[in-house]
């Protein structure tokens, strides 16, 4: 991990320079790292390993948006895991899932079995808070981070983390407030 001892800004700068040189020269490089951001920024393809066994191979986008397991989803970035059971299909090809007593639509990546419980992967940046739609939730953390607002909410007994970008023009929810966790059905990956 050649960049591990550098400060954060220099690490990002050097990572960018390595990628630029790699693309300019057209070389193949193997880069071993535990920093997921380095893997995403420097790779055309990523190999995720778990206990010495290959867990998934793919492009950064494939692995991030379509992980094949909870391990891969959690390893490659922040991920929320919601348990939901399949209720029915809709006319537009979506799946209605029951999560903590609420029903939501998701875009499944394959056939789902009625009544079967699935794990839904939701990335923090793919969710927002609002007054309507989605799932009922309660805010347990609200933290301004500059370019985004960091929230932790409880959906029933499940903690969900989300990051809303550009909070300047959005309503900021306070700890204890009840609201709705909303997301695009295409943003949810069903395992």
Indicate where each model-derived feature is located.
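ABC ATPase nucleotide-binding domains
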Residues: 1-71
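Non-catalytic connector elements of ABC transporters
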Residues: 79, 89-191
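Glycine-centered loop/turn positions within well-structured domains
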Residues: 37, 61, 70, 82, ...
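ABC transporter nucleotide-binding domain
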Residues: 59-94, 115
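Generic alpha-helical hydrophobic packing signal
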Residues: 19-22, 45, 54, 60, ...
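Small-residue-enriched segments and motifs
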Residues: 16, 70, 84, 137-140
């Amino acid at each position: 991990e050649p960049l591990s001892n550098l400060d954060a800004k220099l690490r990002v700068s050097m990572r960018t320079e390595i990628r630029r040189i790699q693309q300019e020269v057209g070389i193949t490089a193997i880069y071993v790292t535990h920093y997921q951001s380095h893997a995403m920024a420097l790779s055309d393809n990523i190999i995720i390993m778990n206990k010495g066994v290959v867990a998934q191979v793919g492009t950064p986008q494939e692995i991030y948006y379509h992980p094949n397991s909870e391990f891969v989803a959690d390893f490659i970035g922040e991920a929320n895991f919601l348990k939901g059971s399949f209720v029915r299909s809709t006319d537009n090809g979506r799946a209605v899932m029951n999560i903590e007593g609420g029903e939501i639509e998701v875009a499944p990546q394959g056939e789902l079995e009625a009544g079967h419980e699935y794990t839904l992967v939701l990335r923090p940046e793919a969710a927002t808070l609002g007054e309507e739609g989605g799932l009922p939730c309660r805010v347990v953390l609200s933290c301004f981070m500059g370019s985004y607002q960091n929230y932790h909410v409880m959906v029933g007994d499940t903690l969900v983390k989300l990051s809303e970008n550009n909070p300047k023009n959005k309503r900021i929810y306070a700890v204890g407030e009840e609201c709705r966790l909303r997301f695009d059905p295409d943003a949810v990956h069903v395992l």
